[in-house]
């Protein structure tokens, strides 16, 4: 199970207009022992772009061999 404040990768495309598969967020709350997560996604200025509840299957931990990437949101 992932822990609060862990960085996670969105592992599917989202219905949220500004999120895409591969975006990185932070777990801010854990539901039902890890069955779901509240995840915050922020922009480069630290402003919240989305705060959404996701199933455990929708996110995964960042792998040690993965490189972070930047993209425009609008």
Language-model-derived ranges and their functions:
Residues 2-65, 70:
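Basic/aromatic-rich interaction segments and small domains that mediate binding to polyanionic partners
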């Amino acid at each position: 199970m992932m822990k609060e404040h862990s960085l996670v990768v969105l592992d599917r495309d989202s219905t949220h207009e500004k999120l895409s598969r591969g975006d990185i967020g932070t777990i801010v709350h854990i539901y039902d022992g890890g069955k779901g997560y509240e995840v915050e996604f922020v922009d480069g200025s630290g402003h919240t772009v989305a705060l959404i509840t996701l199933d455990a299957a929708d996110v995964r931990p960042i792998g040690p061999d993965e490189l972070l990437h930047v993209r425009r949101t609008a």
